[in-house]
UniProtKB/Swiss-Prot annotation:
Residues bound to Mg(2+): 71
Keyword flag Transferase: no
Gene designation: TUBA13
GO biological process: microtubule-based process
Catalytic site: 254
The reaction(s) this protein catalyses: GTP + H2O = GDP + phosphate + H(+)
Keyword set includes Cytoplasm: yes
Localization: Cytoplasm, Cytoskeleton
Region (Disordered): 429-453
Cofactor(s) needed for function: Mg(2+)
Protein name: Tubulin alpha-13 chain
Quaternary structure and partners: Dimer of alpha and beta chains. A typical microtubule is a hollow water-filled tube with an outer diameter of 25 nm and an inner diameter of 15 nM. Alpha-beta heterodimers associate head-to-tail to form protofilaments running lengthwise along the microtubule wall with the beta-tubulin subunit facing the microtubule plus end conferring a structural polarity. Microtubules usually have 13 protofilaments but different protofilament numbers can be found in some organisms and specialized cells.
Amino acid sequence: MREVISIHIGQAGVQVGNACWELYCLEHGIQPDGLMPSSKTIGVEDDAFNTFFSETGAGKHVPRAVFLDLEPTVVDEVRTGTYRQLFHPEQLITGKEDAANNYARGHYTIGKEIVDLCLDRIRKLADNCTGLQGFLVFSSVGGGTGSGLGALLLERLSVDYGKKSKLGFTVYPSPQVATAVVEPYNSVLSTHALLEHTDVAVMLDNEAIYDICRRSLDIQRPTYTNLNRLIAQVISSLTASLRFDGALNVDVTEFQTNLVPYPRIHFMLCSYAPVISAEKAYHEQLSVAEITNSAFEPASMMAKCDPRHGKYMACCLMYRGDVVPKDVNAAVATIKTKRTIQFVDWSPTGFKCGINYQPPTVVPGGDLAKVQRAVCMISNSTAIAEVFSRIDHKFDLMYAKRAFVHWYVGEGMEEGEFSEAREDLAALEKDYEEVGTESQEGDGEEGEDGGDQ
């Protein structure tokens, strides 16, 4: 088996995790108590969904996941919620005091006390796997726990499970909406770790997803539940090929191989189509070409950044539902002819496609309509550098005055770490710039190694 372990860190990670496991259970027909009435093979470990669930002798399915937070309130909602019987109590790990939006607390003082316990639980899950293929790590970089403990855990996972791939689903601060004043600090410090210790990081931001909910689903005031259910659809589409059998299956390591041209250039944009409410879906049937086009629309991107301002290096299209390869090829051919969608000239093909015959499932009573087919796109575009330059700018404004820095230093962090992390991000922005332009100069020689410092 090729198992995947999900790690949900901090409030954002845990709440996105809730939405994801709710959806996985619906997709596989697993009840909130972990039983699966439709399962013919009780206790047999080779069903496709066993990549995400382990099965006990009694036929109960337990998610291969851990939920971590430095304070109990958010995880308590899992402990008392609908799916409380699904998880083993040991999988829900909480501390007593929170990171207070402070990276240093999550990474040094408070995170340090809990991290060994977390790794211990993750080790138990890993020992339960026959062929662990990697980790999915869910967190945000704006708060303290997701950024600090998230970074610490990734560093430790790199040591303990060196070669296993780590995919991060990371909520980045939005341009306009902020939940904390010190977000830029936490983000820069945490991205420094994400650069080193994740293989692929998919960037999400709340503002972009708010806008999608408002525009496409007519939700006037979207809640976090609305946002998380949309994110869950994306993550479900990416992992569908691990959990179901399909025509063109995509492995976790395949994402890496196809999307990451240079080790540092691994921050992805994602989009999902069709995002459509039940009233509208009643009147329209969306073709493969239409959903593919809409996945490339700037408005569909789940992070606030305009792909028209950059070039694509690679792009992964994961279709699910009633889709045949012929339609996909036609849709991709059309995309390639569009002038607005530019690829760097050293990446001539640039597309990886996956098809899964399981149609998308929706949460009953949720916002999304049940559709026949859907597509999720993950793309590596130089435009993502916009996200970093925005955060860097805010970081610089605050750091020039050393505002709020004492909170970090007081928790045992050195001031040099700020400048080190900031320089690393400056180098990253430069890397993106070079990757987009390096192919025009010279005779293509430095194109081979120019962007990989």
